[in-house]
Design a protein with these regions (language model features):
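Canonical Radical SAM [4Fe-4S] cluster-binding loop centered on the CxxxCxxC motif
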Residues: 1-25
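Conserved SAM/AdoMet-binding glycine-rich loop
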Residues: 31-165, 173-176
Length: 297
Protein backbone atom coordinates (compact mmCIF):
# COMPACT_ATOMS: atom_id res chain seq x y z
CA UNK A 1 0.00 0.00 0.00
CA UNK A 2 0.87 3.70 -0.08
CA UNK A 3 0.40 6.28 2.65
CA UNK A 4 -0.49 8.86 -0.02
CA UNK A 5 -2.68 6.65 -2.18
CA UNK A 6 -4.17 9.21 -4.55
CA UNK A 7 -2.21 9.32 -7.84
CA UNK A 8 -4.63 8.91 -10.74
CA UNK A 9 -2.86 6.06 -12.52
CA UNK A 10 -1.62 4.03 -9.54
CA UNK A 11 -2.98 0.68 -8.37
CA UNK A 12 -1.54 0.89 -4.84
CA UNK A 13 -4.79 2.38 -3.41
CA UNK A 14 -6.64 -0.69 -4.71
CA UNK A 15 -4.70 -2.93 -2.37
CA UNK A 16 -5.47 -3.58 1.27
CA UNK A 17 -4.61 -1.10 4.00
CA UNK A 18 -1.03 0.07 4.37
CA UNK A 19 1.02 -2.52 6.25
CA UNK A 20 4.68 -2.84 7.15
CA UNK A 21 6.62 -6.00 7.85
CA UNK A 22 8.31 -6.23 11.24
CA UNK A 23 12.06 -5.81 11.32
CA UNK A 24 12.59 -9.24 12.86
CA UNK A 25 10.77 -11.00 10.02
CA UNK A 26 12.87 -9.17 7.43
CA UNK A 27 16.09 -9.88 9.33
CA UNK A 28 15.23 -13.57 9.59
CA UNK A 29 14.49 -13.82 5.88
CA UNK A 30 17.73 -12.10 4.91
CA UNK A 31 19.72 -14.28 7.32
CA UNK A 32 18.18 -17.42 5.81
CA UNK A 33 19.31 -16.38 2.32
CA UNK A 34 22.66 -15.24 3.72
CA UNK A 35 23.24 -18.71 5.19
CA UNK A 36 22.61 -20.13 1.71
CA UNK A 37 25.34 -17.88 0.30
CA UNK A 38 23.47 -14.80 -0.92
CA UNK A 39 25.27 -11.47 -0.40
CA UNK A 40 23.18 -9.06 -2.49
CA UNK A 41 19.82 -7.70 -1.33
CA UNK A 42 17.28 -5.04 -2.24
CA UNK A 43 14.61 -3.92 0.21
CA UNK A 44 12.02 -3.40 -2.49
CA UNK A 45 8.41 -3.69 -3.60
CA UNK A 46 7.20 -0.80 -1.46
CA UNK A 47 5.67 2.50 -2.53
CA UNK A 48 8.07 4.47 -0.32
CA UNK A 49 10.95 3.20 1.79
CA UNK A 50 11.02 6.40 3.85
CA UNK A 51 7.41 5.89 4.93
CA UNK A 52 8.36 2.71 6.84
CA UNK A 53 6.34 2.34 10.04
CA UNK A 54 4.82 5.80 9.80
CA UNK A 55 7.77 7.79 8.40
CA UNK A 56 9.86 6.84 11.42
CA UNK A 57 13.64 7.29 11.22
CA UNK A 58 14.16 5.28 14.42
CA UNK A 59 12.30 2.31 12.95
CA UNK A 60 14.24 2.61 9.69
CA UNK A 61 17.50 2.45 11.64
CA UNK A 62 16.27 -0.61 13.54
CA UNK A 63 15.67 -2.22 10.15
CA UNK A 64 18.96 -1.29 8.47
CA UNK A 65 21.52 -1.50 11.27
CA UNK A 66 21.39 -5.28 11.88
CA UNK A 67 21.40 -6.00 8.14
CA UNK A 68 24.50 -3.86 7.61
CA UNK A 69 26.40 -5.95 10.17
CA UNK A 70 26.28 -8.88 7.74
CA UNK A 71 28.79 -6.96 5.56
CA UNK A 72 26.84 -7.58 2.35
CA UNK A 73 28.18 -6.91 -1.12
CA UNK A 74 25.03 -4.99 -1.97
CA UNK A 75 22.19 -3.55 0.11
CA UNK A 76 19.85 -1.22 -1.79
CA UNK A 77 16.36 0.23 -1.33
CA UNK A 78 13.53 1.02 -3.75
CA UNK A 79 10.99 3.83 -4.18
CA UNK A 80 10.94 7.06 -2.17
CA UNK A 81 8.26 9.77 -2.15
CA UNK A 82 10.14 13.08 -2.60
CA UNK A 83 8.03 14.96 -0.05
CA UNK A 84 9.21 12.53 2.65
CA UNK A 85 12.92 13.06 1.99
CA UNK A 86 14.87 14.67 4.82
CA UNK A 87 18.48 14.64 5.95
CA UNK A 88 17.99 12.25 8.87
CA UNK A 89 16.51 9.38 6.86
CA UNK A 90 18.89 9.99 3.96
CA UNK A 91 21.89 9.76 6.30
CA UNK A 92 20.64 6.39 7.57
CA UNK A 93 20.52 4.97 4.04
CA UNK A 94 24.03 6.24 3.29
CA UNK A 95 25.36 4.92 6.60
CA UNK A 96 23.93 1.41 6.43
CA UNK A 97 23.51 0.62 2.72
CA UNK A 98 26.10 0.13 0.01
CA UNK A 99 27.11 2.46 -2.82
CA UNK A 100 25.23 2.54 -6.10
CA UNK A 101 21.95 2.93 -4.22
CA UNK A 102 19.04 4.75 -5.87
CA UNK A 103 15.91 6.44 -4.51
CA UNK A 104 13.36 6.07 -7.30
CA UNK A 105 11.24 9.24 -7.28
CA UNK A 106 7.73 9.04 -8.73
CA UNK A 107 7.76 12.65 -9.91
CA UNK A 108 5.71 11.64 -13.00
CA UNK A 109 5.42 15.24 -14.26
CA UNK A 110 6.88 18.69 -13.59
CA UNK A 111 3.82 20.32 -15.18
CA UNK A 112 1.83 21.74 -12.23
CA UNK A 113 -1.45 21.40 -14.15
CA UNK A 114 -0.81 17.68 -14.60
CA UNK A 115 0.28 17.38 -10.96
CA UNK A 116 -2.98 18.91 -9.74
CA UNK A 117 -5.35 17.09 -12.08
CA UNK A 118 -3.79 13.70 -11.30
CA UNK A 119 -3.28 14.32 -7.57
CA UNK A 120 0.40 13.43 -7.86
CA UNK A 121 2.30 13.13 -4.60
CA UNK A 122 4.94 15.79 -5.18
CA UNK A 123 5.25 19.28 -6.60
CA UNK A 124 8.15 20.27 -8.87
CA UNK A 125 9.74 22.42 -6.14
CA UNK A 126 9.48 19.60 -3.60
CA UNK A 127 11.11 17.20 -6.04
CA UNK A 128 14.02 19.59 -6.62
CA UNK A 129 14.48 20.02 -2.87
CA UNK A 130 14.59 16.23 -2.38
CA UNK A 131 17.09 15.85 -5.22
CA UNK A 132 19.36 18.42 -3.55
CA UNK A 133 19.18 16.70 -0.15
CA UNK A 134 20.10 13.28 -1.52
CA UNK A 135 22.90 14.73 -3.67
CA UNK A 136 24.29 16.57 -0.66
CA UNK A 137 24.39 13.50 1.58
CA UNK A 138 24.70 10.62 -0.86
CA UNK A 139 26.80 12.24 -3.58
CA UNK A 140 30.18 10.94 -2.41
CA UNK A 141 31.73 8.18 -4.50
CA UNK A 142 32.02 4.78 -2.79
CA UNK A 143 34.55 1.92 -3.00
CA UNK A 144 33.07 0.36 -6.16
CA UNK A 145 33.27 3.65 -8.08
CA UNK A 146 29.61 4.64 -7.86
CA UNK A 147 28.03 7.25 -5.61
CA UNK A 148 26.56 6.08 -2.32
CA UNK A 149 22.98 7.25 -2.85
CA UNK A 150 21.41 9.21 -5.70
CA UNK A 151 17.88 9.98 -6.88
CA UNK A 152 16.27 8.57 -9.99
CA UNK A 153 13.24 10.15 -11.65
CA UNK A 154 10.16 8.50 -13.14
CA UNK A 155 8.20 10.46 -15.76
CA UNK A 156 4.82 9.32 -17.08
CA UNK A 157 3.25 10.72 -20.24
CA UNK A 158 -0.41 10.54 -21.20
CA UNK A 159 -1.80 11.71 -17.85
CA UNK A 160 -4.93 13.81 -17.51
CA UNK A 161 -4.38 17.47 -18.38
CA UNK A 162 -1.24 16.88 -20.42
CA UNK A 163 -0.62 19.35 -23.24
CA UNK A 164 2.06 20.14 -25.78
CA UNK A 165 3.77 22.33 -23.18
CA UNK A 166 4.17 19.40 -20.75
CA UNK A 167 7.15 17.98 -22.60
CA UNK A 168 8.84 21.38 -22.64
CA UNK A 169 8.22 21.89 -18.92
CA UNK A 170 9.66 18.48 -18.06
CA UNK A 171 12.72 19.19 -20.17
CA UNK A 172 13.23 22.62 -18.60
CA UNK A 173 13.26 21.15 -15.09
CA UNK A 174 15.64 18.38 -16.08
CA UNK A 175 17.91 20.95 -17.74
CA UNK A 176 17.84 23.00 -14.53
CA UNK A 177 18.91 19.92 -12.56
CA UNK A 178 21.73 19.28 -15.03
CA UNK A 179 22.87 22.92 -15.06
CA UNK A 180 23.02 22.95 -11.25
CA UNK A 181 25.26 19.85 -11.49
CA UNK A 182 22.85 17.76 -9.46
CA UNK A 183 23.16 14.07 -10.22
CA UNK A 184 20.37 11.73 -11.27
CA UNK A 185 21.24 8.08 -11.54
CA UNK A 186 18.59 7.46 -14.17
CA UNK A 187 15.43 8.90 -15.77
CA UNK A 188 12.63 6.45 -16.55
CA UNK A 189 10.23 7.68 -19.24
CA UNK A 190 7.01 5.77 -19.79
CA UNK A 191 3.51 6.11 -21.21
CA UNK A 192 0.61 5.63 -18.83
CA UNK A 193 -1.44 2.43 -18.84
CA UNK A 194 -5.00 3.14 -17.65
CA UNK A 195 -6.00 0.26 -15.36
CA UNK A 196 -9.43 -0.69 -13.98
CA UNK A 197 -10.20 0.90 -10.63
CA UNK A 198 -7.90 3.87 -11.11
CA UNK A 199 -8.98 7.42 -11.92
CA UNK A 200 -7.11 7.15 -15.23
CA UNK A 201 -9.38 4.30 -16.26
CA UNK A 202 -12.20 6.81 -16.73
CA UNK A 203 -9.92 9.16 -18.67
CA UNK A 204 -8.61 6.34 -20.84
CA UNK A 205 -6.10 6.99 -23.60
CA UNK A 206 -7.41 10.43 -24.57
CA UNK A 207 -4.20 12.28 -23.70
CA UNK A 208 -1.97 9.45 -24.92
CA UNK A 209 -3.55 9.72 -28.36
CA UNK A 210 -3.57 13.51 -28.27
CA UNK A 211 0.20 13.73 -27.73
CA UNK A 212 1.28 10.47 -29.37
CA UNK A 213 3.29 12.27 -32.02
CA UNK A 214 5.14 14.27 -29.36
CA UNK A 215 6.09 11.39 -27.05
CA UNK A 216 9.11 10.08 -28.93
CA UNK A 217 10.30 13.60 -29.67
CA UNK A 218 10.15 14.45 -25.94
CA UNK A 219 11.79 11.17 -24.97
CA UNK A 220 14.63 11.40 -27.48
CA UNK A 221 15.39 15.01 -26.54
CA UNK A 222 15.80 13.97 -22.89
CA UNK A 223 17.95 10.98 -23.82
CA UNK A 224 20.29 13.02 -26.03
CA UNK A 225 20.48 16.34 -24.19
CA UNK A 226 20.03 15.30 -20.55
CA UNK A 227 20.88 11.61 -20.08
CA UNK A 228 24.08 11.74 -22.09
CA UNK A 229 25.43 14.83 -20.33
CA UNK A 230 24.34 13.48 -16.95
CA UNK A 231 26.17 10.22 -17.59
CA UNK A 232 29.40 12.10 -18.26
CA UNK A 233 29.04 13.83 -14.88
CA UNK A 234 28.06 10.61 -13.14
CA UNK A 235 31.05 8.57 -14.31
CA UNK A 236 33.65 10.82 -15.95
CA UNK A 237 36.41 9.34 -18.08
CA UNK A 238 38.98 7.80 -15.77
CA UNK A 239 36.42 6.58 -13.21
CA UNK A 240 37.27 3.10 -11.92
CA UNK A 241 34.24 0.82 -11.66
CA UNK A 242 35.07 -2.24 -9.60
CA UNK A 243 33.57 -5.72 -9.72
CA UNK A 244 31.79 -5.42 -13.05
CA UNK A 245 30.15 -8.80 -13.74
CA UNK A 246 30.52 -9.69 -17.42
CA UNK A 247 27.26 -11.12 -18.72
CA UNK A 248 27.06 -11.29 -22.52
CA UNK A 249 29.03 -11.09 -25.75
CA UNK A 250 28.06 -9.14 -28.85
CA UNK A 251 30.57 -9.98 -31.53
CA UNK A 252 34.00 -9.11 -30.16
CA UNK A 253 32.53 -6.95 -27.40
CA UNK A 254 31.63 -7.87 -23.81
CA UNK A 255 28.95 -6.27 -21.67
CA UNK A 256 28.53 -6.36 -17.92
CA UNK A 257 27.14 -4.58 -14.89
CA UNK A 258 27.83 -4.14 -11.22
CA UNK A 259 25.38 -5.65 -8.78
CA UNK A 260 22.69 -3.14 -7.86
CA UNK A 261 19.22 -1.71 -8.41
CA UNK A 262 19.94 0.28 -11.58
CA UNK A 263 23.43 -0.80 -12.65
CA UNK A 264 25.16 0.90 -15.55
CA UNK A 265 25.86 -1.20 -18.61
CA UNK A 266 29.61 -1.33 -19.20
CA UNK A 267 30.89 -2.31 -22.64
CA UNK A 268 34.45 -3.52 -23.23
CA UNK A 269 36.01 -3.83 -26.70
CA UNK A 270 37.31 -7.32 -26.03
CA UNK A 271 35.81 -10.79 -25.83
CA UNK A 272 36.23 -11.45 -22.12
CA UNK A 273 35.46 -14.56 -20.14
CA UNK A 274 31.88 -14.30 -18.90
CA UNK A 275 30.50 -14.87 -15.39
CA UNK A 276 33.57 -13.22 -13.92
CA UNK A 277 34.26 -9.89 -12.17
CA UNK A 278 36.51 -7.20 -13.66
CA UNK A 279 37.72 -3.78 -12.57
CA UNK A 280 37.14 -1.35 -15.43
CA UNK A 281 38.34 2.18 -16.21
CA UNK A 282 35.77 4.31 -18.05
CA UNK A 283 37.13 5.60 -21.38
CA UNK A 284 33.99 6.76 -23.23
CA UNK A 285 30.23 7.29 -23.00
CA UNK A 286 27.27 6.13 -25.06
CA UNK A 287 23.73 7.52 -24.67
CA UNK A 288 22.85 5.31 -21.69
CA UNK A 289 25.92 3.14 -21.17
CA UNK A 290 29.68 3.48 -20.80
CA UNK A 291 32.76 2.05 -22.49
CA UNK A 292 35.62 0.77 -20.37
CA UNK A 293 38.94 -0.99 -20.46
CA UNK A 294 39.79 -3.81 -18.08
CA UNK A 295 42.39 -3.07 -15.41
CA UNK A 296 42.49 -6.43 -13.67
CA UNK A 297 41.05 -9.81 -14.59
Amino acid sequence: GCIMGKCSFCTEPLKAKVEWRNQKDIHNEIKAFYDLGERNFRLGKQACFFSYKGINATEIEKLLNPISKLKLNCLHIDNVIPSLVDEDKTKLVVKYCTEGNVAAFGVESFDVDVVKQNKLNTSPDTAIKAIKIINKIGGKRGPNGMHYFLPGINLVYGLKGESKKTGDINFEYLKKILDEKLLLRRINIRQVTPLPGTAMWDVGTKFLKKNKSNYWKWRNKIRKEIDFEMLKMLVPKGTIMKNVWMEVHDGKHSFGRQMGSYPLIVGVNDKLELKKHYDVEIVDHMLRSVVGKVLTA
